[in-house]
Each structure stands twice: as C-alpha cells, then as structure tokens.
Amino acid sequence: MKSARRRSRELATQGLYQWLLSGSPAGEIDAQLRGAQGYDKADHEHLDAILHGVIRDSEALSADLAPCLDRPIDQLSPVERAVLLVAAYELKNHIDIPYRVVINEAVELAKTFGGADGYKYVNGVLDKLSAKLRVDETQAAARKQ
C-alpha cells in the first residue's frame, strides 16, 4: 500500500509534467489534480507544498540542478525533469525528510513514470545534488560507512 506522501509525490510529478508541457497556471493544474485517481489518499498539504513550491521556485531549482546534469535541463525528458524538480524541492525545503528517502522516492517515481533507465540518471543527479544541498547529512552518512 502506498503512503499518503508517496501519492502526493506521484500527483505532484503528474501535475508538474503537465505544467512543463502546457504551461498551464498552477491553480488550473491543482484543480485537475483534485479530481485525479488517488487524490483522496494523498497528503494534500505536502502535494500543495510541492506543486506550488516547484512552480514558484522552478528557476532557482533548475539552477541548483544544472551543475549536476550532463546536458541543459530543458533537454531532459519532461518526466525526468518533473521528478528531479520534486526531489530538488524536497531536498532544499523539507529538511525533515532524510536525503536518502528523497532520492529513493524520486527513483521510484522515475521507475513508475519514466523510461527504462531514467531512474539511474535521476539517482546519479540526486546523489550529486544532495552532496551540495545537504552537506552535513551526506558527510555524516559517508563517515558511518
């Protein structure tokens, strides 16, 4: 059974995918997501934070991701881009969620919605990004190994 947080990440990824392709306003995407399958079992507060936060902060999040990518962000598939934006937002704004959980959730989203090996790319990018955004946490984890 999927957790409410996982459902919120799935819906946010779907909404951001739509936003990346259509450029629709956040309010319109939000309204459509409220009718989506699984919405009733999602963490609505987390979904709203991710969806609206990523759209609001997309330029800054893209700038954070850029040094970790092997190509310009606009050349990524919309699915990979949406997944990476969700994870970047969580790494930056939800310090209560361990970085390994953020990466694992993003990998699962990439497996669910992305291409065959997209999850490997997402994992590599987020390893680099977490080392930048969560320095103390990633260094402490490295010392434990």
Curated annotation (Swiss-Prot):
Highest taxon of the lineage: Bacteria
UniProt GO MF annotations: RNA binding
Pfam families: NusB
Range of residues in the leader sequence: none
A GO CC term attached to the entry: cytosol
Any single biological process term in GO: transcription antitermination
Keywords, ordered alphabetically: RNA-binding, Transcription, Transcription antitermination, Transcription regulation
InterPro entries: NusB-like_sf, NusB_fam, NusB_RsmB_TIM44
The UniProt record lists the keyword Oxidoreductase: no
Transcription regulation among keywords: yes
Coiled-coil intervals, chain numbering: none
Family the entry assigns: Belongs to the NusB family.
Biological role: Involved in transcription antitermination. Required for transcription of ribosomal RNA (rRNA) genes. Binds specifically to the boxA antiterminator sequence of the ribosomal RNA (rrn) operons.
Record's protein name: Transcription antitermination protein NusB
Species name: Paraburkholderia phymatum (strain DSM 17167 / CIP 108236 / LMG 21445 / STM815) (Burkholderia phymatum)
Gene: nusB
